Regions:
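Acidic/His/Gly-enriched intrinsically disordered linker/tail segments
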Residues: 239-256, 268, 272, 287-410
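N-terminal secretory signal peptides that target proteins for export/translocation
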Residues: 1-7
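Compositionally biased alpha-helical segments
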Residues: 25-166
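Bacterial N-terminal signal peptides
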Residues: 9-21
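Short, isolated positions in well-ordered beta-strands
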Residues: 52, 81, 177-178, 389
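Intrinsically disordered, low-complexity terminal regions
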Residues: 5, 22-23
Length: 410
């Protein structure tokens, strides 16, 4: 679902009685919303199923001491739109659902929106049943208080590391907490790519935008200089990352910390930010189940090309990978099984992901979802696309001009 950026005011004034009108809960709703006036809230979903994602709550409209509507400024917009409370299905602020209406109306648009939500709920129930059958536990559903506590903990961690790296300045988006010594004017467009990546993956996987995904927020620590990046990794997180530009730390408790340095190429920096945080998103989506490395890297590379339009890294990697495959006739060692694929294989991984998504994005989401539910990779591929890994290699080989492409090194 997309946010309502640029939606005409007339469309936003949903006055049809799809939901129960203002009543006793409207009084308490005012108490819950008033502290957020002037701030960005998570979500306002209309009865039609359309959504304001990360809007600014410009004001609360009241009549006879009851809430009758909201004044919202859609993300990235300057104008304020008034939305009737009778047409609102759900309001989420500070990770807390502060309003969820009971459906009563019969108008076609509202029924369509309700059916969409019911279909998503049925999918979630079926997914939960498959997880249970596979012995897989989903990530815990956190309360608003638990999300807030995690953000507080992350900020305390940043305060601690600023004692060693005092140049780090702290900023926030709705989904990300950012600590960086990169000049703010230089950093801003790159940080904007992070929220774009978040929304893009929500749409790819069929996850409603505006719903909580991270544990609190994803922490991004971006250094200007490589030496500080290496010193932080070795001295604070006790990991050796010499020779890399960024890394995504994905903890078993759900916390995600992405650390990087700017480097000399702005487009490469932008792509790397998206690539690494994409790994964090995949870690947090649904369950802790790990994706195979070729798929995880392929998704991260492909998403980077969609979010960072001016980055030529991935097409160049795919071209080099194609030349390698034409020369060797193989994907190289352990492509489907390696814990970490070889640098040459990144272009193969992104090429396979791009091919699968271009064939059917919905089936691709089902394929990834199946793995996160605990289904073995090849079984999930068979269920979604009707083929095996060997079939995938044959199709990909044909696409890159290597009809006899092999997975072996022979």
């Amino acid at each position: 679902m997309r946010s309502l950026t640029g939606m005409p005011r007339l469309v936003a004034l949903v006055a049809l009685s799809a939901f129960a009108g203002p009543s006793a809960w409207a009084d308490t709703l005012a108490d819950k919303l008033t502290p957020h006036v002037g701030e960005t809230i998570d979500l306002v979903e209309l009865g039609t199923g359309r959504r304001f994602v990360r809007p600014v709550l410009a004001g609360v409209v009241e009549k006879n001491d009851a809430v009758t509507g909201l004044r919202l400024r859609a993300e990235g917009q300057k104008t304020v739109t008034t939305v009737s409370l009778s047409g609102i299905a759900k309001i989420v602020a500070d990770r807390e659902t502060v309003h969820e209406a009971e459906t009563t109306g019969r108008a076609f648009a509202q029924l369509r929106g309700r059916r969409g939500r019911e279909a998503y709920d049925r999918q979630a129930e079926a997914s939960a049943a498959r997880m249970k059958a596979n012995g897989v536990e989903p990530w815990p559903q956190l309360t608003a208080e638990e999300h807030a506590a995690e953000v507080t903990s992350l900020k305390a961690f940043v305060t601690e590391i600023r004692q060693k790296f005092p140049g780090l300045a702290v900023s926030e988006t709705h989904e990300f907490l950012v600590a960086s010594d990169v000049p703010p004017a230089q950093l801003a467009p790159f940080v904007a790519n992070l929220d774009s990546m978040h929304d893009f993956l929500c749409e790819l996987y069929g996850m409603p935008t505006g719903e909580p995904l991270w544990k609190g927020k994803c922490l991004v620590i971006a250094f200007l200089n490589e030496a500080d990046y290496v010193a932080f990794e070795e001295g604070v997180l006790k990991s050796g990352m010499q020779g890399t530009q960024g890394v995504c730390h994905q903890r078993s408790d759900g916390r995600v910390i992405m650390v990087c340095h700017r480097g000399a190429d702005p487009a490469a920096f932008a792509h790397m930010l998206v690539h690494e945080t994409c790994h964090g998103f995949n870690h947090r989506w649904m369950t802790p189940q790990r994706l195979p490395n070729w798929l995880n890297e392929g998704i991260a590379e492909w998403v980077g090309t969609r979010v960072v339009k001016n980055c030529e890294q991935v097409p160049l990697k795919e071209a080099r990978a194609a030349a390698f495959m034409r020369s060797k006739g193989t994907l190289g060692p352990g492509f489907f099984t390696a814990a970490n694929i070889e640098p040459m294989q990144y272009g193969m991984a992104s090429g396979m992901v791009r091919m699968l998504i271009s064939r059917d994005a919905r089936k691709f989401a089902e394929f990834v979802r199946g793995i996160k539910e605990g289904t073995p990779v090849e079984e999930s591929l068979q269920r979604s696309f009707g083929g095996s890994l060997d079939d995938l290699v044959k199709a990909y080989g044909a696409a890159v001009g290597v009809p006899n492409l092999s997975t072996t090194d022979e």
